[in-house]
Amino acid sequence: MELHILEHRLKVASIAKENIQLFTYGLIKLAFLSSKTRCKFFSLTETPEDYTIIVDEEGFLELPSSEHLSVADATWLALNVVSGGGSSSSSQPIGVTKIAKSVIAPLADQNISVFMLSTYQTDFILVRERDLPFVMHTLAAEFTILQVVNGETVAADNLGVTNGFVKPKLVQRPVIHPLSSPSNMFCVTSLDPYTLPTVTTLLMDVMFYSNGVKDSVVGSEEPGHIRFFSFSLIEGYISLVMDVQTQQRFPSNLLFTSASGELWKMVRIGGQPLGFDECGIVAQISEPLAAADIPAYYISTFKFDHALVPEENINGVINALQVSQAEKH
C-alpha cells in the first residue's frame, strides 16, 4: 500500500455559530466560486457547537482576520492511503476501519496526534507538519511513502528519525471519553461539480441560514436530533455528510449514493472539548470497529469527534465501545 503526503499546508479553525455571518462572504467564495481562488482543500463542518473549517493556506487568505476565528496553532499536512492495483472489492471495509491497524494505531502508539476527515471519496489523516518525520519513520515499514510536489507524486525524502524513537509496548486503549448517539440518520454523498450551481442557493441555506443559533444547542443528556452538516471541496471533488431530513431537500437525481443507499448513525465522542494534543482518541474508536469488521467514516472537529457507522450496526458498536470504556475502570 502507498501512503501519500499531499502538498496542502492546512489550517484548522473554529467559528462560533453566532459569528458565522462575519465569514460567509469568504466561505461562499471557497465553496462555490473556487475557480476565483487558489484554494485546493476546503472543508466546512457544522456541529451543535460551532463551525469547523479545514482549509489550505491559500484558502485561509480568503477569510477575514478576526478575533472570532479560533485557529489551531499548528500547520497540518494531509495524508491518505492508496491501495495498490485498484482491485479492491466493494465488500472491503471502507473508511477509517481500513486504516485503523496500519496507520491510526501505530501513530497513537508513538503519541502522534491525528485529526481525521473522512469524505465520500477517501479518508484524510491530518498530522502536524512538525510531526512528519516521526510519522514517516513509524509508517515506513508498512507503506511505500510518496509525496506530492508541484502536483507530481514522487518518492518522499527520507525525513525519518530514529533518535529517541522507542518501539512501543502494545497497550490496551480503552475508550476514555463519553459517547452519545443522536437519533438522526445520516448519508454520505457527493455531487458532480458541474451541477453545483443548480443547488448553490439550497446549499447556502443549509450551511448558513437554516436551523440558526436557536436550534444549535441540544443537551447531550437527551441525545435527540443534532445539527450536523459537512461540506468538502478537495482537489475538485465534493463530499457531503448530512442527515436524511436535509438530504430530502435536494433534487434526488443530483446526489450520488451508494448502490445500497446505506444510511449511517453517528457516535459523538467527547463530553468536554477534546483539544488537539491528546493522542489515541481516533484509535480508541477505530480499533474496536476494525476488530468487528464494521466500516466507519470519521470526522474530527475543533471540539468533538464523530464516527459514522451503518445504522444496522449501531447497537453493536455502542456495546463494543462501552465494553472498551468499562475496561478503563
Curated annotation (Swiss-Prot):
InterPro entries the record matches: ACT-like_dom_sf, CASTOR1_ACT-like, CASTOR1_N, CASTOR_ACT_dom, CASTOR_fam, CASTOR_mTORC1
Keywords: Cytoplasm
Tagged with keyword Cytoplasm: yes
Cellular component GO terms held in the UniProt record: cytosol
UniProt GO BP: negative regulation of TORC1 signaling
Domain ACT positions: 72-139, 262-322
Localization annotation: Cytoplasm, Cytosol
Origin: domain of life: Eukaryota
Main location: cytoplasm
Family, as annotated: Belongs to the GATS family.
Function: Functions as a negative regulator of the TORC1 signaling pathway.
Subunit: May form homodimers and heterodimers.
Record protein name field: Cytosolic arginine sensor for mTORC1 subunit 2
Organism: Xenopus tropicalis
